[in-house]
Amino acid sequence: MIILFVDFDYFFAQVEEVLNPQYKGKPLIVCVYSGRNEKSGAVATANYEARKLGVKAGMPISRAMELAPNAIFVPMHKEVYTEVSNRIMSIISSYSDKIEIASIDEAYIDITSKVKNFEEAIELGKKLKREIMEKEKITVTVGIAPNKVFAKIIADRVKPNGLGVVKPEEIEEFIKSIDIDEVPGVGNVISERLHSLGVNKLIDILSVSFDKLKEEIGEAKAFYLYRLATNSYFEPVLNKERVPHGRYLTLPKNTRDIKVIELYLKKAIDEAYNKIEGIPKRMTVVTIMQDLDIVSKSKTFKTGISKERAYTESIELLKQILQKDSRLVRRVGVRFDNIYKSKGLDVFFNS
């Protein structure tokens, strides 16, 4: 197998930097405020300038203010991050039909059938990074390895904006280099128990009896670590329903000319709808404005929507956006979700 893992670098904070270029290069902290006062709540994420000052995700905002009093503190804009994530996931999914979305800012794709060897995989990884940067102005880190776990570990080592590779002939030495705390799924409690057994490296697992390991951390976790240490972990990439069916296109120039925008919107619908295996019940028209702000409008259809009706309904949604927003449009796109698998005559009820 050749697995490619993608991690969006300091994602929430990076989106804020894209939308607010004046934040770039300054300590930036994205917060989840509790509402009691300006210091209550927790840090969601921070850019690398803030991390250098000791700020970490999950830290109380009050503590972050002590460590970085001159930092920029902003509230989370979850809908914006979700929209950007959906667009990036759409790009990633175009590189493989086997995609597993692990979180809002992480995904795995199986590229075994897309490349002949790891050299081609590296070139594909570079191409993916370039496309995401060109279209979304977001840097990502890519890890490539024979399994999902090693792909994530090597990516974590080369962040931010890196590309790390573990080739099959390098696996033996790579396994020896892995600290047990680097392994995904090994939290603080399990880490302490493993260290008490003398397990500091992943390879140290092999020096502990399986029964003892199972007694300390449970059979499932013991088996997981044993398989990693013996290079026998080959869990497949699992396709998840969260993969967005969307397409976004950049206009020739920023404009409010609805006829121009319509042409690109219809093209986006064609490309997105033709990839759907089933019938969508929800459609979202997305516009990215001249300042990279995102404005979207959605509509749900009880029995699903045909491509022909998607054309007409999308124009109505576009008109609603333009009526409420006076800015020029830079990009336009569409997203379909709530897909159901039924095929047949019911789609004509809404055509």
From Swiss-Prot:
CDD domains: PolY_Pol_IV_kappa (cd03586). It is an enzyme of class 2 (transferase). PANTHER family: DNA POLYMERASE KAPPA, DNA REPAIR POLYMERASE UMUC / TRANSFERASE FAMILY MEMBER. InterPro entries: DNA/RNA_pol_sf, DNA_pol_Y-fam_lit_finger_sf, DNA_polymerase-Y, DNApol_IV, PolY_HhH_motif, Rev_trsase/Diguanyl_cyclase, UmuC. Residues 3-187 form the UmuC domain. The active site is at 106. The record marks 12 as: Substrate discrimination. Mg(2+) binds at residues 7, 105. It catalyses: DNA(n) + a 2'-deoxyribonucleoside 5'-triphosphate = DNA(n+1) + diphosphate. Gene3D superfamilies: 3.30.70.270, 3.40.1170.60, 5' to 3' exonuclease, C-terminal subdomain, DNA polymerase, Y-family, little finger domain. It comes from the Archaea. GO terms for biological process: DNA-templated DNA replication; error-prone translesion synthesis. It comes from Sulfurisphaera tokodaii (strain DSM 16993 / JCM 10545 / NBRC 100140 / 7) (Sulfolobus tokodaii). This is DNA polymerase IV. Poorly processive, error-prone DNA polymerase involved in untargeted mutagenesis. Copies undamaged DNA at stalled replication forks, which arise in vivo from mismatched or misaligned primer ends. These misaligned primers can be extended by PolIV. Exhibits no 3'-5' exonuclease (proofreading) activity. May be involved in translesional synthesis. The gene is dbh. Its EC number is 2.7.7.7. Keywords: DNA damage, DNA repair, DNA replication, DNA-binding, DNA-directed DNA polymerase, Magnesium, Metal-binding, Mutator protein, Nucleotidyltransferase, Transferase. Belongs to the DNA polymerase type-Y family. It holds the Pfam family IMS_HHH. One of its GO terms (molecular function) is DNA-directed DNA polymerase activity. Binds 2 magnesium ions per subunit. Its cofactor is Mg(2+). GO terms for cellular component: cytoplasm.
